[in-house]
Every structure is written in structure tokens, then in C-alpha cells.
């Protein structure tokens, strides 16, 4: 195994040297291999996978043509949400937790898996508390809706010689008093106001919780990419490729969760790119702590189980209950198959790229 690995490295080095000699300008030939540059580039490439779902998920206009005024009602989006649940569960039980337990088993002084279990429960509990707090604010806003159109009463009074209520002026009718069919005018104005309120409806806290969990997850990806490039260029390329393949289906599921939470397509894409900044931060931390690898691993060992707890909350508490309300048998089967496919895809990624 070692002989094959060294032969591979020598072969790659020879090809690299030939390409440099034949095609690269003299200015670039003086550059040496700098792991921190490739670490940041790898993290950026992985972060750009956040815009990939824009290609797959249809636009709001296309959904409207299909009869879905709310993107959350789209059958395709519900299938993607099922895929997201499967991907999250597969990521938790086939990648995050096994890696966390492996780290716990290396410490003979601690009870195996106890620390990881506590961090998983902490992640679930903290995400639950945050969602309860912000859901309470949202419920309070829903219980105090905006007043309905009152111009009808005022305008009718005006037309029939009545008096406007004290403090009201003719401007409150917006000039609608001179139009014969006052009721329809006011009704249209009320509908416009309601439509505007729907557009400005605050995004659900589940979307922000998902972004928080993804930021923490991307931080660990940055650590892994930078750590691999510090070992060798070949290890770094393989790690970047493996994480990228792992992230693309993950990003599609995350994108669907953000759409369900009230984000527009472009808002969701921008938010996904912002979470990629955590990957750059993770890469910088790994580079800065490259001389104290064991100490850094000890300090960041809680991140994976905590993220697993957050993913479990999002998948089983936030997304899955809505999917269970599906009444059409055909759609339920499609959603179940998408969930299983999400788990299977994460299993394949784990078998191919985890060591």
C-alpha cells in the first residue's frame, strides 16, 4: 500500500513538472507549494456548492404557473425536503457520530461515547430552546394582525353625507370617495395590503437554525481540508473532492429547507454562500494550529456531536412532521423513496471516501 502511494505521488509530481515546464510562464515556476493557499481555495470551492441548487430547484414563477402560490406547497419541494431528511439522518448516523465515537474511544480515561452522547443531547436541547423562543415571538405577531380595510365604512359615510369619525380625514379614503363602486376599490386595496404583508412575512426560525448548523458543519469541513493539504497536496485534493461530493446533495436538501422557511431562491443562495465563510474560518484555524494538532483536536472534538444533535432536531422535529401530513398516497411513496435515497446516498459517500 505504501509503495503504491509513493509511486502515485512520484507519477503526479512528474506530470506536474512536465506541465509546469511546457505551459506555465516563468513567473509562476518560482512558486513553491503553499498549503494555506490551497486550503483556502479548497474551502472556497466547497462553499460554492451552495449555489448548485439554483440549477435544480424551479423558480417561483415556474411554481406559480404550476398552480403553487406558496413554494412550500410544491410537490417537488416536498420530495426534496424528504431527501433532505434522509441526507441529514444519513450524515448524522453514518458520518458525524461514528467519527465522534472513534475519537472518544481513543481516550481510555473517559467512558466510550458518553461525551459525544451528551453533546448530541446538548445540540438537540439548544436548538429546541432557540426555536421555542423565536416561535413564541412569531405567534405573538400572528395574534395581532393588521386591521382590515376601514375605508369602506368611511367612504360610504362620505357618499351619504355622513360625518367621518373624529380624527379621520378624507385622505384616509385615498380619494376613493369619488369613485362610484367604493366597496370594490377598498376591497382591492385591502387585497394589495394583504399581499404585501405576505411578501414581508418574517422567515421561519427553522431556516436560521439550519444555517447555524450548516455553519458549524462547514467549519469542520474547513478543518479537514486544511489538515489534508498540510499533509500533502494529494491528500488535500482527495479530501476536497470527497467533501464536495458529500456536500452537493446536502446543499440541495438545505436549500429546500430554506425555501420552506420563507426564503426566496436568491436569499437562500446568498445565505448558503455566507455559511461557507465558516469553512474559511475552519481552514484558517487548522493552519494556525498546525503545530499543535492534538491540542486543537481536543478543543474541537465537541463540534461534530453537537452538529449531529442540531441536524437531528431539524430533520425529525422541524421538517418531518410537515411531511407526515401528506394525504396523497402517490406523493407519500415518492417522499418515502426520496428519504431512503438520501440515506443511501450518504452511505455510499461514506463507504467511498471515509477511511
UniProtKB/Swiss-Prot annotation:
Annotated transmembrane regions: 37-57, 79-99, 118-138, 273-293, 301-321
Any Gene Ontology biological process: zinc ion transmembrane transport
CC annotations in GO: basolateral plasma membrane; endoplasmic reticulum; Golgi apparatus; Golgi membrane
Membrane topology: Multi-pass membrane protein
Coiled coil: none
InterPro entries linked: ZIP (IPR003689)
Pfam families with a match to the protein in the record: Zip
Recorded superkingdom: Eukaryota
Family: Belongs to the ZIP transporter (TC 2.A.5) family. KE4/Catsup subfamily.
Function: Involved in zinc transport and homeostasis.
Protein name: Zinc transporter ZIP13 homolog
Taxonomic path: Eukaryota, Metazoa, Ecdysozoa, Arthropoda, Hexapoda
Gene giving rise to this polypeptide: Zip99C
Amino acid at each position: 500500500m505504501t509503495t503504491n502511494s509513493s509511486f502515485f505521488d512520484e507519477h503526479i509530481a512528474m506530470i506536474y513538472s512536465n506541465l509546469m515546464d511546457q505551459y506555465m510562464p516563468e513567473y509562476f515556476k518560482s512558486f513553491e507549494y503553499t498549503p494555506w493557499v490551497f486550503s483556502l481555495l479548497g474551502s472556497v470551492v466547497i462553499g460554492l456548492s451552495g449555489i448548485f441548487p439554483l440549477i435544480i430547484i424551479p423558480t417561483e414563477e415556474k411554481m406559480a404557473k404550476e398552480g403553487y402560490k406558496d413554494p412550500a406547497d410544491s410537490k417537488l419541494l416536498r420530495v426534496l425536503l424528504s431527501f433532505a431528511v434522509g441526507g441529514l439522518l444519513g450524515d448524522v448516523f453514518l458520518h458525524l457520530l461514528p467519527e465522534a465515537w472513534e475519537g472518544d474511544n481513543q481516550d481510555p480515561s473517559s467512558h466510550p461515547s458518553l461525551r459525544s452522547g451528551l453533546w448530541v443531547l446538548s445540540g438537540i436541547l439548544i436548538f429546541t430552546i432557540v426555536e421555542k423562543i423565536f416561535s413564541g415571538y412569531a405567534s405573538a405577531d400572528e395574534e395581532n394582525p393588521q386591521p382590515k380595510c376601514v375605508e369602506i365604512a368611511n367612504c360610504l359615510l362620505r357618499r351619504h353625507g355622513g360625518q367621518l369619525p373624529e380624527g379621520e380625514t378624507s385622505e384616509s379614503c385615498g380619494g376613493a370617495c369619488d369613485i362610484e363602486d367604493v366597496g370594490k376599490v377598498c376591497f382591492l386595496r385591502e387585497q394589495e395590503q394583504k399581499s404585501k404583508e405576505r411578501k414581508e412575512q418574517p422567515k421561519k426560525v427553522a431556516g436560521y437554525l439550519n444555517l447555524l448548523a450548516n455553519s458549524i458543519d462547514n467549519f469542520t469541513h474547513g478543518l479537514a481540508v486544511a489538515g489534508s493539504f498540510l499533509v500533502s497536496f494529494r491528500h488535500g485534493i482527495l479530501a476536497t473532492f470527497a467533501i464536495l461530493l458529500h456536500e452537493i446533495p446536502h446543499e440541495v436538501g438545505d436549500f429546500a429547507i430554506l425555501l420552506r422557511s420563507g426564503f426566496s431562491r436568491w436569499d437562500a443562495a446568498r445565505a448558503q454562500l455566507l455559511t461557507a465563510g465558516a469553512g474559511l474560518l475552519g481552514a484558517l484555524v487548522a493552519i494556525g494550529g498546525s503545530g499543535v494538532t492534538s491540542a486543537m483536536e481536543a478543543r474541537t472534538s465537541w463540534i461534530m456531536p453537537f452538529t449531529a444533535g442540531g441536524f437531528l432536531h431539524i430533520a425529525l422535529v422541524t421538517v418531518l412532521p410537515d411531511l407526515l401530513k401528506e394525504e396523497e398516497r402517490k406523493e407519500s411513496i415518492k417522499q418515502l423513496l426520496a428519504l431512503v435515497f438520501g440515506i443511501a446516498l450518504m452511505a455510499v459517500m461514506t463507504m467511498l471516501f471515509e477511511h
